[in-house]
From Swiss-Prot:
Transmembrane segments: none
Function: Condenses 4-methyl-5-(beta-hydroxyethyl)thiazole monophosphate (THZ-P) and 2-methyl-4-amino-5-hydroxymethyl pyrimidine pyrophosphate (HMP-PP) to form thiamine monophosphate (TMP).
Listed cofactors: Mg(2+)
Record-level GO BP terms: thiamine biosynthetic process; thiamine diphosphate biosynthetic process
Chain sites annotated for binding 2-[(2R,5Z)-2-carboxy-4-methylthiazol-5(2H)-ylidene]ethyl phosphate: 151-153, 183, 203-204
Alphabetic keyword roster: Magnesium, Metal-binding, Thiamine biosynthesis, Transferase
Entry-linked NCBIfam families: thiE
One GO CC annotation: cytoplasm
Keyword Amino-acid biosynthesis included in the entry's annotation: no
Gene: thiE
Domain of life: Bacteria
Reactions catalysed: 2-[(2R,5Z)-2-carboxy-4-methylthiazol-5(2H)-ylidene]ethyl phosphate + 4-amino-2-methyl-5-(diphosphooxymethyl)pyrimidine + 2 H(+) = thiamine phosphate + CO2 + diphosphate; 2-(2-carboxy-4-methylthiazol-5-yl)ethyl phosphate + 4-amino-2-methyl-5-(diphosphooxymethyl)pyrimidine + 2 H(+) = thiamine phosphate + CO2 + diphosphate; 4-methyl-5-(2-phosphooxyethyl)-thiazole + 4-amino-2-methyl-5-(diphosphooxymethyl)pyrimidine + H(+) = thiamine phosphate + diphosphate
Name used for this protein in its record: Thiamine-phosphate synthase
Species per Swiss-Prot/TrEMBL record: Histophilus somni (strain 129Pt) (Haemophilus somnus)
Cross-referenced Pfam families: TMP-TENI
Length: 221
């Protein structure tokens, strides 16, 4: 199926966040997320993933869904793809553009079936074997590789890889759109793309920034 977004282009600067990532601000975390997301969208992020997970995430299902819808609406306003992490039922219900699943989440073929092909599907890759499986699975449209560097943003992060792993992925003829993730800073972007990544996914680089517009522009440089 043809998606309305070019996925390789969407991977250029992929922002991932939930309210748990913006609790360091003074006001309500849900409001904080919407503020940070809109600033990032205005500055030029190319994709956003709603990832509401962990001990500090919203626990109330009504508030959770309302926040997801508000994030989706912002993404639509700026014509940027809106991806939901793991929660396939939510993604289908609110009309997400994409769904991202980890290695222990629902298999991509089931995700594609449940969203009746209307969503693009991404998965997480931490080994060459997983990369080959993703490459050969017609239900996988892109994959995230990482963590490339140590990260504090994910409580359940896999073992740290290295930038060289991206080169190894491409050397194994794995050519689907690929985004690097995990502890990535502005200074790392050009090097990671030179090794074969289509772009970078970041959480704290944006959520911890004192000047979101400047940071996003630098990440896109």
């Amino acid at each position: 199926m043809q998606h309305k977004y070019d996925i390789a282009t969407a991977m250029r600067l992929y922002f991932i966040a939930g309210s748990q990532d913006v609790t360091h601000f003074a006001s309500d975390p849900a409001d904080n997320l919407l503020s940070v997301l809109e600033q990032a969208l205005q500055a030029g992020i190319t994709c956003y993933q709603f990832r509401e997970k962990g001990k500090r995430a919203l626990q109330n299902p009504i508030a959770y869904k309302a926040l997801a819808i508000a994030c989706r609406n912002l993404c639509r306003k700026y014509k940027v793809p809106f991806v939901v992490n793991d929660d396939v039922a939510l993604a289908v219900e609110i009309g997400a553009d994409g769904i991202h699943v980890g290695q222990t989440d629902m298999p991509p073929h089931q995700v594609k079936r449940l969203c009746t092909g209307k969503c693009f599907v991404g998965t997480s890759v931490n080994t060459i074997e997983q990369g080959l499986i993703a490459q050969n699975d017609p239900n996988v449209d892109y994959f995230g590789v990482g963590p490339i560097f140590p990260t504090q943003s994910k409580e359940d992060a896999e073992p740290v890889l290295s930038p060289a792993f991206i080169t190894q992925i491409r050397a194994n003829h794995i050519d689907k759109p690929m985004v690097a993730i995990g502890g990535i800073k502005v200074k790392d972007v050009a090097m990671l793309m030179a090794k074969g990544a289509n772009g970078v996914a970041v959480i704290s680089a944006i959520t911890q920034s004192n000047h979101i517009e400047k940071t996003v522009k630098e990440l896109l440089r």
